[in-house]
Swiss-Prot record:
This is Large ribosomal subunit protein uL4. Residues 43-101 are annotated as: Disordered. GO terms for cellular component: ribonucleoprotein complex; ribosome. One of the primary rRNA binding proteins, this protein initially binds near the 5'-end of the 23S rRNA. It is important during the early stages of 50S assembly. It makes multiple contacts with different domains of the 23S rRNA in the assembled 50S subunit and ribosome. It comes from the Bacteria. Gene3D superfamilies: 3.40.1370.10. GO terms for molecular function: rRNA binding; structural constituent of ribosome. Part of the 50S ribosomal subunit. Keywords: Ribonucleoprotein, Ribosomal protein, RNA-binding, rRNA-binding. Residues 50-59 have a biased composition (Basic and acidic residues). It comes from Salinibacter ruber (strain DSM 13855 / M31). The keyword Cytoplasm does not apply.
Amino acid sequence: MDVEIYQEDGVESGETAALDPTVFDIEPNDHIIWLDVKRIQAHQRQGTSKTKERGEVRGSGRKLYRQKGTGNARVGDAQSPIRRGGGRAHGARPRDYAHDLNQKEKRLARRSALSYKAANDNIQVIENFSLDRPDTRGLTDLFELLGVEGQDILLATAEVEREVYLSSQNLPDVNVQEVQSINTVDILDADVVLLQEGALDWLTDVLSTDEAVPA
């Protein structure tokens, strides 16, 4: 599968880039995608929810009234979970929600997400570019020339491009990240995945192999 390579000014360069079928044209594995999305979202949870249980609520521990002779149901102290102001029974406790997948599963999830995008012609390739200073107007003009304005855009850069990143901060529908940082959720959330040539090379090199390299 070949796609046009665009220049920094949004004009076709006349060259094409090949999308490796082992990365961009596989049978997507929906279950692995779900597992990876669940993993990513679990890592984003703070897990700091906390409620006071019976032994932590402030107050006296004395028995409210004698056991027998009042005609009322027997009770203990005021911290009982069944009383107003008492402790919470089985309340929330701080916990770690994180869980992990192995490297092959993470790569398969990203390949599956990229294959969905490629199947719908939602992957574009642009030459590597940098900015001397933040330029939001220039970035929006580029997206208009590429015909992707108004869509949720994931721009994967070959390297850390601080000025390009800063240029996107006032654009709520644009996500600029170095290619090594993008994950399955980033890909799925985007309507269009815009890859710099170097980013495409990195994805092809890393996701097309099962060797132990950073992913």
